[in-house]
Each structure stands twice: as C-alpha cells, then as structure tokens.
Amino acid sequence: MNKLVIRGGKKLSGTVAASGSKNSALPVIAATLLTPDGTFGINRIPDLKDVRTFIQLLEYLGAAVSFENNRLEVSSSDLKSIEAPYELVKKMRASIYVLGPLLARFGHTRVSLPGGCAFGPRPVDLHIMAMEKLGATVTIEQGFIDAKVNGSRLRGAEIDFPISSVGATGNALMAAVTAEGKTVLQNAALEPEIECLCRFLQKMGANISGIGTTTLVIEGVDQLKAVEFDNIFDRIEAGTLLGAAAITGGSVTVTGTVPEHLGSVLDAFRQAGCIVTVKDDAITLTAPEELQPVDITARPYPEFPTDMQAQWMALMTQAHGDSTIIDRIYLERFNHLPELNRLGAHIEIRDNWALVHGPQELTGTKVMSTDLRASACLVLAGLVAKETTEVLRVYHLDRGYESIEKKLSALGADIKREQYQEFS
C-alpha cells in the first residue's frame, strides 16, 4: 500500500497546470454509451483511479476503449451487457451514471448500488425518481437497481428535483436526450460539470436549452453521434493547489483554469487575507503574513463547494482566530477532523458544524485517509506541520488527484510516495 511522506515547513512557489476534471469526465464518459455510432475522442481526461475504474466498467459492458496521454477513445458499437456488476460499481459511486444511458439505449438495465467515499448517506432516490418520471419501472432487488422502459422508449416529462443533485441531474439529462417528446428539469444542478455534460450532449446532437440555469429543457432526438470533445479543467484540484500556497505562506500560480468556476473559493481566500489575481486562465495566490479566520458553509454551486470543505478546515487551523465550517450537502463529512486533531489541531464538532480554533502549531505524525477530500486536507496539513507527516491509504487521494505529489514537489514541497505494509 502507498503513503505520502511529507516534511513540512516549505513555502510553495511557482506555476503549475490544472488537470482535467474528474467530476465532469465521468458523466461524459458514461454518455458515450448512448450511441453505437462511431468512435469518441475526448481530451483532458485525468489519469485517475476512478477514471480507470470507469474504463473497466465500459470494457465489461463491451465497449472498445483506448486511454493514453489524457486522451480517451471509446466505441460503444458492440456492447454485450446491460448490467453494471457489484465488483466494479462498489469501488466508485459515480458508476451510477451508466443508469440513464443504458436505460435510454436498451430499454433495460441493471446497475449495482454504488460505492465510493464512505461518509454520510448516499441515497439513489433522486436517480430512481427521474427514471420513473421518464416512464421506467424501477425496482431494487438483491443490491441492484433494475430499470425497464414501459414501451419502446422513454417519454419526456417534467422532473422537479426537491434538492439540487449533480448526479441525478446528469443521469436525467442522459436518459432524456433520446426520450420521446420534451423533458423539463426543474431545480437542475448548476455545477460547471453539468454544463460540460450538456455541451458534450449538444455536440452529439442533443437538443438542450437553458444551460447554466436551474431549468433545463430537453427535446428528445432520434439519433446521436460520436464526436471529439475537450473536457473542462478541475476546479477542485485548482482550489486545493491554491490552498497549499495559502497554508504554507507561499505564492503559486495555477494555469489552465476557468476562474469564474472558483468564484466562491477565491472570495474566501481573499477574505482570509490572501492576494488573489486572475489573468485569462491563470490564478495567482499569495499568502498573507497572518491568515484571517473565515466562516464557510458548503452548499451547491455557485456557493462554496463541499469538495473544498476539508481543505478549508486544514487552512483554518493556521488562521489567527476561530472559524466555523458547515456542510449543507453532506452533514457528516467530517471524517478528517480526528486526524487533523492528531496533528495538533483544535477542532470541535457542535451538532452538524465544526469550530476550528486557530492558529495551532501542527506536528507531523502518521494519519490515515478516510476519503478523497479528507486525504487532500491531511496533505495540506502535512505541508505546514513541523517534522514528518505520513499520510496512509492514499489510494483515496489517487481517486481524484492526478500525481499531486509531483505537482507539489515541483512547487517546492518535500513530499514523496513510499510503500508500506498495513497490518490487518
């Protein structure tokens, strides 16, 4: 098993490029299942564990896949299965994205209940509700979601999501693009990753309007085609790298970004006293002499992202004053808190929010990753901690960050990957 060994205390400086977004790549890859027509070519696909798992799933279904130098080529002309098995789906909750495309194309699919990060409830109710609204009969039996179309194809419908859900919005989009008639998605997710999926589906021939708003209107089409497409860059990775600059007192430029996708995060950095400048696709952050405490509440886009909440908690351990952190999306997403406290942080849980007392001097020790963003949080803490921090179980980190230790090392961090034996 792999761990990251970090010797903290180095101010980071320099320029680093953002990778392609995992959270947009996965639904885009799933959408290639919608048509047997041609071979897709998709650029800027990050080489991550979750992407590799999704490729395995496509290959299991019968797709021909080539992945090299961040370019993915997919042909779904000869699929042999409509079932996504537990052995693959258990590794990653985003596997649920195959539900809509397989149902739309074949009229029947069986998808194992998903896995992924182990924090809080992960209901699939909104995905099921969307498929049922479009005319499918859905049952859950023996750990599988079994969905069947009543008739020759799905039928357009009005779907009003009770809460904003990126996953359910994506699945509903992919199911609706070839449905008969018009589908209206109300309270659709606003995240840039959904806009990216919409642009991809449009390029394939889908008829979608209202992109970038909470109301998406889809007029079903009879046929879609394979296309070339460029994935968007990863706003969460960019935010994490900027956080590494802020926590170490450094100055870092992240290129290849879409700065407006990070508006709420950049605002929070500025409130903390950081100097943040934007020029074209580049964001430069210079840390202040003293970080100021900033309260954040994680909510759906365009508010502060839940996927940056853990990293922000690490940063606030160094702020001169107390701060509060609330997560309105995943109320229990605080698995990183005990490990931060092991490093010397002073963080308390009050009901469903965290109180971070700062500043606290952190001292390196062994800490264990529990999920993807918790791993990133512990890496940031290790960068500022005295002595040596060992972040164990970094397979979580590899699910969402492409060679992050290489990027941090290039910015001046003393960080390396090592193998270790974990005792059962």
Curated annotation (Swiss-Prot):
Q: What is its main location?
A: cytoplasm
Q: Which residues form the active site?
A: 117
Q: Which PANTHER family match?
A: UDP-N-ACETYLGLUCOSAMINE 1-CARBOXYVINYLTRANSFERASE
Q: Which domain of life is it from?
A: Bacteria
Location of 2-(S-cysteinyl)pyruvic acid O-phosphothioketal modifications: 117
Q: Name one Pfam family in it.
A: EPSP_synthase
What HAMAP family would the database entry show?
Answer: MurA
What InterPro entries does this protein map onto? Enolpyruvate_Tfrase_dom, Enolpyruvate_Tfrase_sf, MurA_subfamily, RNA3'P_cycl/enolpyr_Trfase_a/b, UDP_GlcNAc_COvinyl_MurA
Q: Which residues bind UDP-N-acetyl-alpha-D-glucosamine?
A: 93, 122-126, 307, 329
GO CC, alphabetical:
cytoplasm
* Gene name of this polypeptide: murA
What is the name attached to this protein's record? UDP-N-acetylglucosamine 1-carboxyvinyltransferase
**Functional pathway:** Cell wall biogenesis; peptidoglycan biosynthesis
Role of this protein: Cell wall formation. Adds enolpyruvyl to UDP-N-acetylglucosamine.
Task: Recall the GO molecular function terms of this protein's record.
Answer: UDP-N-acetylglucosamine 1-carboxyvinyltransferase activity
